[in-house]
Design a protein with these regions (language model features):
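A domain-level signal for caspase-like cysteine endopeptidase catalytic cores
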Residues: 1-73, 108, 112
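Short acidic, S/G/P-rich loop/turn micro-motifs used as interaction or catalytic elements
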Residues: 18-22, 52-56, 79-85, 115-119, ...
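Structural alpha-beta junctions
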Residues: 34-45, 99-107, 128-138
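Short, charged beta->alpha transition segments
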Residues: 60-64, 90-100, 120-125
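Active-site microenvironments of hydrolase-like enzyme catalytic domains
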Residues: 72-82, 134
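Conserved residues at the C-terminal ends of beta-strands
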Residues: 77, 112, 138
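A short, glycine/acidic-enriched catalytic loop
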Residues: 79-108
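Active-site-proximal C-terminal subdomain of hydrolase catalytic domains
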Residues: 116-232
Length: 233
C-alpha cells in the first residue's frame, strides 16, 4: 500500500560529511537537530541525503525534490571556504536549488557553512527569477553546535510562514529577527580569514526576495539585527 503523507511543509537537508575529528566516521550530523524542529512543528516532514561533490549533490537534490509542499526549505550543511560549499561552488548550489524552486515550492535556502555569507552579491543574483524568498549563511567560520542551533531556530520560524508572509519585506525581516532573538549578537560565532574573532551580528547574513512584481533580492542583515535589538528587554 502506498503511504500517504499529510504534512504541509518540508525541510530538505543536503549534508556533506563533517569529519570533525579523526574518528568521526559520518557520526556528526545536523539531522537529529532538524528532526526536532519537525517534531515541534508537527506538520513538517524532514528529508535527508548526503553529498560529496557536484554530481552527488544533484542526485541528492533530485532524490529529495519528489513532492510539492505548501512551504519547502532547503538546508545545505557542509564545510565551506571562500566560494565553495564542500567541493561545490555557491553559485552552482543556489542555481540548482533555484531551478527546482517553482516546481517544488522551495521558498528558502539555509546554508550552514563557513564563509558563504560573504557572497551576498551571489545570493542576490541567483535568487532573482526563482521562487526562493530568502537565503542565509555565515561570512566567517561558525562553531558547529552553536551554528546548528541558530540554523534550526531560523528553519523553525521560516518554515512556519505562509505564502502571504513573503509579500512584505518588513514582515520577513521581523521573522528573521524573532528567530535569532534568543542568541547574543555579540557572541563570537567564529573567525575571519585572518583568524580574528567575528561576532554573530557581523557574520550571519540574510538576503530576501519578497514575492510580488518588481521586488528584487537584497541583503537585509543590518535591518534584521536592528529589529532583533528592539525585541530585547
Amino acid at each position: 500500500m502506498t503511504k500517504r503523507h499529510s504534512s504541509n511543509r518540508a525541510i530538505l537537508i543536503l549534508e556533506s560529511p563533517w569529519e570533525l575529528d579523526y574518528s568521526d566516521s559520518n557520526r556528526t550530523s545536523v539531522l537529529p537537530f532538524v528532526e526536532g524542529v519537525g517534531k515541534l512543528a508537527g506538520d513538517t516532514e524532514v528529508y535527508h541525503a548526503n553529498f560529496y561533490d557536484k554530481s552527488s549533490f544533484l542526485k541528492a537534490l533530485d532524490c529529495l525534490c519528489k513532492r510539492k509542499f505548501t512551504n519547502t526549505t532547503v538546508y545545505i550543511a557542509a564545510h565551506g571556504y571562500k566560494k565553495k560549499v564542500g567541493s561545490v561552488s555557491i553559485s552552482d548550489l543556489i542555481w540548482e536549488v533555484g531551478l527546482r524552486s517553482k516546481e517544488c515550492n522551495i521558498t528558502g535556502l539555509m546554508i550552514g557553512s563557513c564563509f558563504v555569507g560573504e557572497n551576498t552579491s551571489t545570493m542576490e543574483a541567483y535568487l532573482e527569477g526563482t521562487n526562493l524568498k530568502w537565503c542565509a549563511g555565515y561570512s566567517s567560520t561558525s562553531l558547529w553546535l552553536e551554528g546548528t542551533l541558530i540554523d534550526c531556530a531560523i528553519l523553525s520560524r521560516m518554515t512556519d510562514l505562509d505564502e502571504t508572509d513573503y509579500a512584505d519585506k518588513d514582515n520577513m525581516i521581523h521573522h528573521f529577527a524573532s528567530s535569532i532573538a534568543a542568541f547574543s549578537d555579540s557572541f563570537k560565532i567564529g573567525r575571519d580569514y585572518r583568524n580574528q574573532p567575528v561576532p554573530l551580528n557581523k557574520s550571519l547574513q540574510f538576503v530576501i526576495q519578497p514575492s510580488g512584481k518588481g521586488k528584487r533580492a537584497k541583503c537585509v542583515s543590518e535591518e534584521v539585527f536592528e529589529v532583533r535589538e528592539s525585541l530585547q528587554l
